Amino acid sequence: MQEATIAAIATAPGAGGIAVVRLSGAESYQVAARVFCPANAAKKVEQAKGYTAMYGTFREGDEAFDEGVALFFRAPHSYTGEDVVELSCHGGNAVARRLVEACLAAGAQPAAPGEYTRRAFLNGKLGLTQAEAVMDLISADGRQGAALANAALGGALAKKIDAQKQELTAIQAHLAAWVDFPEEDVPELDDDHLHRVLSGVKEELDSLIRNYQADTILREGVDCAIVGRPNAGKSTLLNLLAGFDRAIVTPVAGTTRDVVEQAVQLGDVRLNLFDTAGLRETEDAIEAEGIRRSWKKLEEAGLILAVFDGSEPPTREDLALAQRCAGRPAIALINKEDKPTRFDPELIAPFFAMVLPVCCQEEGSRRVISAAVARLLGTSQIDAHAASLSGQRQLSAALRARDAAAGALDAAAGGFGLDAVSVCVDDALAALCDLTGENASEAVIEQVFKRFCVGK
C-alpha cells in the first residue's frame, strides 16, 4: 500500500533565518504546487526535475503569506527514497506553522516522530545502525561525538559487522555441507582455520564492547559530581569549568546548601556538573539535607571531582570522602596550589585514579583537569572515525554475538563436535543480523524511531 504524503517542520523551533517544511511521498509535488507559486510563471512545480530549486511565494488559498525557495528531489534519489520537496520560508513559528497547515489542507498528512528516517530505512536508503546514527548526530554536543555518529552514518559499523558475518557465513556453509551431505565427501574444517576465524570475530566484537562506555560518553556526556568539604573550592571549580559565575562563592562555609547543576563542554566531553553542599557534620536541618543529597550525587555520578583544600592538613571529613571515592571514577583535586601546601596527597592517593594539584581560579587548571578527565574516561584513546556501538540495543546484540563466538570456540576446543560449533555459529550470526537490523521486528523498529523528533 502506498504511504501517505507527509509534512512537518524539519528545522528547530523558534526565531531564525529560515525554517524548512519537508514533504515526502508520492503526492509531494502536487501538494507543493498547491502552496507554492514560482516567480517565473513558465515554470511548473509538477514538472520540476530532481536536485533543482525554484524561487516564489507561499500561498494559502488566494493569499500569499511569505516568499522563499522550493528544493525538489525525485525518487529514489532523496533522503527517504520517495519524492521529496523542501520548502524554505522565513524563520519563526508563525510562518512555518502556517506553511505546514497549508500543506495539510492541500492533502498532506502530519509526519510522526522519526517518520522521514523510518521511511529511509524501510526504502533501503539507510540501515538500522545508520538510522540510529542520524539521531546521534543530531544530539551530538562535541566534535568527537559528532564524528563517531558521522562514521556510523557513513556505514562504519555496518561494514565491520558485515565483514564478521561473511566470515561466519563461510564457516557455517562448510559446516552445513559437511553435516548434511556426508556422501559428498566434503572435507572437514581445518581446526586452525576454524579457530582463527572464530577468534578474529570474537576479538573484533570485544574491541567494540570495550570501547562502548567511552564512545557513549562522547555521544551523551557524563554526570559529574563536584564534592568536598565547605570552602575547599567546589563552587569556584564549577565557575572555572563553566566559564562564568554560575555558583555563589563566599568565604562563609556552607554557602552552597543545594545541588547546583550546569552542563559544560570540557574538551570533547560534555560534563553535567553537580556542585554539591560542603560535606561536614552539622545541626542545621537544611544544610544536612543538602549534604545527604551530596552523598547521593556521589553514588550516582559517572565521574567524581573531589576537591580538597591544599592549604590545610587533611581532616576527618577529607579522609571519609576519599574512602567513599574508592573504586569509583574519581579524580582528587588538591586546590589552592598558589598557597603554601599543608595537605599530604599520599594520604588519599590510594583511593583515587589521579591526584592533581590545581588552583581553581586559574585557567591553566581547566586544561589540566580536561586532559585528566579524558584520560580517566578513556575518551582520549578513541578513534572517532572508527566503528562504534551506540545504545543498549546494539550493545546487547554485540554481547550475544561475542558470547556465541566464544561458545563456538569452547565447543571446538572441548571436542563437543561440529554440530555444537554449528549451533553457536548460528546464534552469533542471528545476533549480528539483529544488530544491523536485518531481523528487526516491528517492535524494535518502533523503539528505535520513537526517540526521533517530528521532522526527521
List each model region and its residues.
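Inter-motif core of Ras-like GTPase G domains
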Residues: 287-311
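Short glycine-/small-residue-rich Rossmann-like dinucleotide-binding loops
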Residues: 242, 277-278, 302, 309, ...
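Short, Asp-centered acidic motifs that coordinate Mg2+ and/or phosphate
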Residues: 271, 303, 331
